[in-house]
């Protein structure tokens, strides 16, 4: 086992998330400073499919920066989709497409959720590109962490597991339990822990358990399967949003109300049911442990020192 040394996360110069993370005392390093350090950081790419790209960047970088490992992050977006909520200037400055990195290998990859879950996969306008990216991860990434719709897309493409519509939106903060205890990804997890969900579709436990290569790691009575993975750890599927900030569900609720969409307040979220109050962050410890375990045990401990090996 390699010795672990406290190291920062390396991010692009001038990325807006930098100032937020510095104020939160997250250990980060910009590119120009990182060049003076003679070590190999972990190469992590993030395929950011969320409409609120800058907020998602901050959420994920916060978690990756709270580990004792130096991480070099590349941000990716689909070239076949033009986001409405992110400027072209931001994308041009900080993002790459798969064509620009497909000859490279990465230690780890994160594929985010996306607001397209009610569409059939093949109706998503970047689905063909998405399948190419998922195929690419098999040969070019040591371990890939899929989140929410990203998890559903990965399960469908790699294993043929279909998502199923829910009668009502699964929306709130739910308790979860461990299904197994001798798996590195779950090291240090509480027996019961909380995480947010925000989705209109689900994947059934029975469908996952029919695939010999997969294992269910954590579940919720209300929310169903929460974490599943391939038995070799190369693919991890998280159905919820442990990366969310305390206010994220509140913003989603207020957005839907403003649009006139019938929507109940998030379950187990607002203090005493007061929708004007800022809820406490009940899942911070779980989220940090999930990402640090993935980064350490499934990426750092498994990746070759020379990525081309």
Curated annotation (Swiss-Prot):
Top-rank lineage group of the source organism: Bacteria
Active site: 148 (acyl-thioester intermediate), 241 (proton acceptor), 243
Reactions accelerated catalytically: L-homoserine + acetyl-CoA = O-acetyl-L-homoserine + CoA
Gene Ontology molecular function: homoserine O-acetyltransferase activity; homoserine O-succinyltransferase activity
Pathway membership: Amino-acid biosynthesis; L-methionine biosynthesis via de novo pathway; O-acetyl-L-homoserine from L-homoserine: step 1/1
Disulfide bridge map: none
Predominant location: cytoplasm
Cell location: Cytoplasm
Binding site for substrate: 169, 198, 255
GO CC terms, sorted: cytoplasm
Keywords for this protein: Acyltransferase, Amino-acid biosynthesis, Cytoplasm, Methionine biosynthesis, Transferase
Biological processes per GO annotation: L-methionine biosynthetic process from homoserine via O-succinyl-L-homoserine and cystathionine
EC number: 2.3.1.31
Chain positions of site Important for substrate specificity: 198
Positions bearing the site annotation: Important for acyl-CoA specificity: 117
Family: Belongs to the MetA family.
UniProt function note: Transfers an acetyl group from acetyl-CoA to L-homoserine, forming acetyl-L-homoserine. In vitro, can also use propionyl-CoA as acyl donor.
NCBIfam families in alphabetical order: metA
Record protein name field: Homoserine O-acetyltransferase
Organism per entry: Shouchella clausii (Alkalihalobacillus clausii)
């Amino acid at each position: 086992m390699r010795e672990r040394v406290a190291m920062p996360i390396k991010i692009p110069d001038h990325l807006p998330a930098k100032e937020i993370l510095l104020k939160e005392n997250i250990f980060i390093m910009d590119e120009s400073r990182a060049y003076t350090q003679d070590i190999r950081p972990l190469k992590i790419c993030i395929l950011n499919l969320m409409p609120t790209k800058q907020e998602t960047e901050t959420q994920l970088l916060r978690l990756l920066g709270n580990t004792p490992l130096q991480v070099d992050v590349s941000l990716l977006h689909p070239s076949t989709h033009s986001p409405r909520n992110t400027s072209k200037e931001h994308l041009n400055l900080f993002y790459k497409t798969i064509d620009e990195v497909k000859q490279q290998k990465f230690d780890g990859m994160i594929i985010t959720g996306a607001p397209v879950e009610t569409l059939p996969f093949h109706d998503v306008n970047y689905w063909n590109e998405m399948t190419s990216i998922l195929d690419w991860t098999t040969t070019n990434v040591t371990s890939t962490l899929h989140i929410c719709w990203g998890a559903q897309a990965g399960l469908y493409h790699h294993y043929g597991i279909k998502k199923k519509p829910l009668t009502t939106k699964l929306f709130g903060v739910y308790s979860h339990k461990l299904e197994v205890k001798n798996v590195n990804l779950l090291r240090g997890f509480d027996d019961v822990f909380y995480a947010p969900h925000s989705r209109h579709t689900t994947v059934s436990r029975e469908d996952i358990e029919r695939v010999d290569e997969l294992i269910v790691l954590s579940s919720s009575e209300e929310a169903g399967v929460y974490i599943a993975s391939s038995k070799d750890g190369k693919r991890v599927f998280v159905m919820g949003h442990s990366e969310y900030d305390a206010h994220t569900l509140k913003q989603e609720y207020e957005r839907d109300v403003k649009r006139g969409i019938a929507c109940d307040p998030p379950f187990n979220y607002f203090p005493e049911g007061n929708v004007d109050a800022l809820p406490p962050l009940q899942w911070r410890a779980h989220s940090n442990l999930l990402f640090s375990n993935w980064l350490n045990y499934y990426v750092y401990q498994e990746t070759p020192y020379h990525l081309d090996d």
